[in-house]
Regions:
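An N-terminal low-complexity regulatory-tail signal and nearby short nucleic-acid-interaction modules
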Residues: 1-17, 33, 37, 47, ...
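Intrinsically disordered, low-complexity sequence elements enriched in Ser/Thr/Gly/Pro
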Residues: 9, 24, 66-69, 110, ...
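A generic structural signal for solvent-exposed, polar alpha-helical segments
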Residues: 12, 24, 43, 105-108
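Short, surface-exposed loop and linker segments with low hydrophobicity and enrichment for Pro/Ser/Thr
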Residues: 17-18, 116
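Winged helix-turn-helix DNA-binding recognition segment
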Residues: 18, 22, 35-97
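Residue-level marker of intrinsically disordered, low-complexity segments enriched
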Residues: 5, 11, 93-94, 117
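Short alpha-helical "packing" element that flanks the helix-turn-helix/winged-helix DNA-binding module
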Residues: 27-31
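Charged low-complexity intrinsically disordered patches
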Residues: 98-134
Length: 134
């Protein structure tokens, strides 16, 4: 599983129809975090950007959901077109449809926080500590 990097998560997700369904939202965000951000190969098959190979049991283990909860959440995401799942006897291929809409290539659009806008964030050790001093 990827341990570095980040994903973009637009605030419009707050208005998404599945946002209030914790299991479905959790699975979708987990897939956004774990699908390939660039094409890879796995055991002789091409796994494209926005895809990953996993089983329902693996996703359940990674998310803390039960297999039944993952299956139900996946059905929600498939029904509304966010995710496609192709199952074989050996693996499952999960695809976040329209991945580039969620995670565009290149630099994000819009204003950027931090020094480019004249705002300097706190560096390491500069956050307010428990002693009340900066």
């Amino acid at each position: 599983m990827l341990e570095g990097g980040f994903i973009l998560l637009h605030r419009s997700i707050l208005r998404w129809e599945w946002y209030g369904d914790l299991n479905t939202a959790r699975l979708f965000i987990h897939l956004l975090l774990t699908v390939n951000y660039e094409p890879q190969r796995w055991q002789g098959i091409a796994v494209e950007r926005g895809q990953r190979v996993a089983s329902l049991a693996k996703l359940a283990d990674e998310t803390g959901l039960t297999v039944k909860q993952v299956r139900t959440a996946l059905e929600h995401l498939k029904r509304t077109g966010e995710v496609t799942h192709t199952a074989t006897s050996k693996y499952g291929l999960f695809t976040v449809n329209h991945y580039d809409r969620y995670q565009p290539r290149g630099e994000p659009e819009g204003p950027r926080p931090g020094m480019e806008n004249g705002i300097q964030g706190a560096g390491g050790g500069q956050a307010k500590g428990s002693n009340g001093r900066k």
